Amino acid sequence: MAPVRGDGMRGLAVFISDIRNCKSKEAEIKRINKELANIRSKFKGDKTLDGYQKKKYVCKLLFIFLLGHDIDFGHMEAVNLLSSNKYSEKQIGYLFISVLVNTNSDLIKLIIQSIKNDLQSRNPIHVNLALQCIANIGSQDMAEAFSNEIPKLLVSGDTMDVVKQSAALCLLRLFRTCPDIIPGGEWTSRIIHLLNDQHMGVVTAATSLIDALVKKNPEEYKGCVSLAVSRLSRIVTASYTDLQDYTYYFVPAPWLSVKLLRLLQNYNPPTEDPGVRGRLNECLETILNKAQEPPKSKKVQHSNAKNAVLFEAINLIIHNDSEPSLLVRACNQLGQFLSNRETNLRYLALESMCHLATSEFSHEAVKKHQEVVILSMKMEKDVSVRQQAVDLLYAMCDRSNAEEIVQEMLNYLETADYSIREEMVLKVAILAEKYATDYTWYVDVILNLIRIAGDYVSEEVWYRVIQIVINREEVQGYAAKTVFEALQAPACHENMVKVGGYILGEFGNLIAGDSRSAPMVQFKLLHSKYHLCSSMTRALLLSTYIKFINLFPEIRGTIQDVFRQHSNLRSADAELQQRASEYLQLSIVASTDVLATVLEEMPSFPERESSILAVLKKKKPGRVPENAEIRETKSPVPNSHNNAHSNAQTNHTSSANNANASSDLLGLSTPPASQSGTLIDVLGDIYSTANGNSNVVNNSKKFVFKNNGVLFENDLLQIGVKSEFRQNLGRLGLYYGNKTQTALQNFVPTLQWSAEDALKLNVQIKAVEPTLEAGAQIQQLLTAECIDHYLGAPSIVISFRVSGGAPQKITVNLPLTINKFFEPTEMNAESFFARWRNLGGEQQRAQRVFKAQQPLDLPGARNKLTGFGMQLLDSIDPNPDNMVCAGIIHTQAHKVGCLLRLEPNKQAQMFRLTIRSSLEAVTQEICDLLVDQF
C-alpha cells in the first residue's frame, strides 16, 4: 500500500491504535520494541528516506518518549527535518528538538545553525517556529547564541507583527534565564516605544517584556511610564479611540489594560510630571466611574473582564497612596462588593481593603465597613473568605475599636476553623498588647485565649504575657488573682498551668492574705495539675515550688516531701531528677538570706520588637502592616530550663548550666568539678534519702535515638551525656556523678577503640582529675571526627577505687554509632522512589522481618526514627502506616545516601525493615542498629 501523503500519517495512527489495544504492560513493551527495531532499521538502511517518512518515524519516536521510554537515536533525522521547506516536517523537527534534545547534545551546534537559518528566512512561519523552539528550550546557550538576532527582529521595521509578538515573548523567556541578554543604550528607547504599536499582540507581549525589564533596571526604563499612561488613557477614555477591534464583552482590551496598570506599579510614584500624573488619575477615575455603571451584558465574561481592570486599578491607587479622594472612592467601591453574591469578588474585596486599611487616607473609610466584615468572619461558607475577613479586622484595628474587634475575634475563635486558629491567636495577642490602655484587660484577653484555644497558643504568646506582668507592677496582683481563679477550672489547659505556675511563683505572695488563696491552697492547686502535665511543665512547676519555699516558709516541709518523692528523684527524665535533687538540697542547706537572694523576683526585661509579631510575619510575609510594630522585652524566654533559676541561682546551681547546655558544651567552659559543701553540691546526701538499690542501669542501647540523658548508673556512679553532631563532627560531654559518701580515688576514664577503627572514627578525649569527691560531679569532653564509614562504636572504661574497697572497672559503650552523623534529607515522592529504584542492587539493600518487642506503637516508632537522625518523609508511601526516611551520612571521605522503609503489620505484631544505601557495609550496620529497637 502506498503511504498516505499529507499530515495524516496512517502508520503513526496504526501504531498508536496498537499501543492502546495492548492488554498488558508486557504486550505494550513488546510492541514498542518491535517498532523501535523497525525504525532503527529504516534509519540505518540503504534506502534514502523522504521527508514524509522521516517525519512519520520521528513522530513515532516522540510518542514512545511521551509514554515514558528512553530514546537514544533519531536525533539526526529530526535535525534534518529542520532544513525542510514543508511546514509540517519542520514543525515535527522543532517539536522533537524542543522535547528530547538537551543542551549538552553533540548536535547542539548544528541545531543552532539551523535555527539561525530560519530566523533569517523571509517566511514568517519559519521564523515563528524557530522563535518558539528557542523559547521552549530557553537555555543559557540559546540566550548567548541568539542575543543579537532576537532584539533585532523585535525592533526592526521590516518584521511582521506576528513575528514581533513571538520575538518579544521569546526575549522575555531568555531574559529570565540570562538577565544580561538585552543590550542597553539605544535599544532601551526602541523597546519602550513598542508600547505605541498598533498591533494588539505586539503591544501586549511587549508590555510583559518591559515589565520584567523594569523590575531589573527601573531607572533605565523609566521612560515607559508616560507611554504606558498615554496608551492606557487612549484605551479607557469614553471615545474608545484605540484598539476598537479588541473589545471583549464591551470591555476594551482588558488584558492589555491590566498589564499596563501592573507596569505602572513598578514605580512609586509613577511620575513626577504633573501632566502625566493628572492623566493617570483621570484614567483611574474613569475606571472607577465605569464600575458604577449598569452592566452592559449579563454574561459572566463581561463582569470578569470589567472587575479585572477595576481591581488592578485599585491596586495601583493603593500603591501610589497619594490621592485621598481616589483611595476613599476605591474603598467605597470595594465595600459594595462585600455583599456581592460572587464569593471570589468578596474575597478580592476583603484582600484589597486589607491594603487600604494601612493607608492614613483610607483607614477611617475602611472602618465604616466593620460590621459587615465581622459578619463575613462569622457567616461566610468559604474558609478562605473568613480568613480574609480576620486579616481585614486585624488591619483596620486601632485604639478606638480594639476592644470590640478583639472581643469579636475571641467569640469567633471558639468555633473557628482549625486551619486559622493559630494565626487568629497571634493576631488577638498582638492587638491586645498594642492597644491595651489597661493591662488588666490584656491579662484577661490572653488568659481567655489560652482557655478557648490553648492548643494553638504558641510559646511566644504565653512568654509575652509573663514578661508584661513582670514589667508592670500595677498588674501583678491582678494577674496572680486571675490566673489562680483560672486554674480552679476542672479542665485546665497545660499552657494555663505554665502561666499560672510562673506568675504564682513570682507573685503568689500578693494574694496569699486571702484565705481562699492561702499559700497551701495555691500549692495544692498547682500540684493537682502536676501529674497531668508534660515533663517540661513539671520542670517549671518544680521551679515554682522552690520559689514557694522562699515566699511561704510555712509550707517548706510539704514541698520538700514532693521533691523527695520517688517519681521525682528517680524520674526517667534527667531534667526533673536534677531539679528535684538540687532544689531539695538547696532548701535544706541554704540559709533564709541566701535562699532569698537566689530566688528573688525576676528583674524587668529590656525592650525589643515583639517576637509574636515576628512569628506572624513569618507565617504571612507581606501581610502584616508595617505600622504594627510593638516593643517587647529582650530577655531569656521563661521556659522550663530557666524560669525560676533567677539571678544568683544561675551562677550557683548546676541546673543553670543545664539552661545553657549547648553553650557549655560548645564553649568547653564548664567548671571541672563542683566542691562538696557548697550550694552547687548537687548530689550531697540526697541519695541516702532515696530508696537505695543495687540495680545497674545501662542505657547505651537507647542512645541510638537520643543525644542527652543518663548513660549509665549503679550504686556508686552515675554517668550522664550531652552531645551535639554537625555533619562529620561531634562533641560529647560526659558527666560523672559520685553517689557515695566517700571520694573515688584513681578515677581514670580510658577510651577503648582500636587503632584500625581510629582511622575511620577519630575520637579525642580530655583527661579529668583523678579524684572524684563525695557527692561531686565532673565533666569530661570528647570530640569525634568521622573520617570513613565504620562499624560498632567506641567504649569508655572507667577505673577507680572506693576508699577502703576493691578496685572498680566499668565499661560503657559511647553514643557514637554511625547514625549520629546523619543529615536529614527532604525529598518528594518522585525523587524518593527514583532513588529507591536506583539503590535496588543486591549489595545495596538489606531487609529484616522481625517480631515487635512490645505492642505496636506507631507514633512511638515515628519518634524513634526522627531521633535516629534521618528525615521522616510524610505522604510518600501509599500506606499511611508505613514510615519512610531519607538521610545522608557525612564522613570526611565521602557522603553516603540512605533510604529507609519501615512497614508495620498490626495483626501479626511484626515489622518489615528495608534499608538501601550506596555502601553495603553501611546498609547492614544501619539495619543492625534498628532491628532490635522496635
Curated annotation (Swiss-Prot):
Transmembrane segments: none
Signal peptide positions on this chain: none
GO cellular component: AP-2 adaptor complex; clathrin-coated pit; plasma membrane; presynapse
Region (Disordered): 623-670
Superkingdom per UniProt: Eukaryota
InterPro entries assigned: Adaptor_Complx_Large_Subunit, AP2_complex_asu, ARM-like, ARM-type_fold, Clathrin/coatomer_adapt-like_N, Clathrin_a-adaptin_app_sub_C, Clathrin_a/b/g-adaptin_app_Ig, Clathrin_app_Ig-like_sf
Keyword Ligase: no
Biased composition regions of type Low complexity, renumbered to the chain: 646-663
Annotated function: Adaptins are components of the adapter complexes which link clathrin to receptors in coated vesicles. Clathrin-associated protein complexes are believed to interact with the cytoplasmic tails of membrane proteins, leading to their selection and concentration. Alpha adaptin is a subunit of the plasma membrane adapter.
Identification of the protein by name: AP-2 complex subunit alpha
Gene this chain is encoded by: alpha-Adaptin
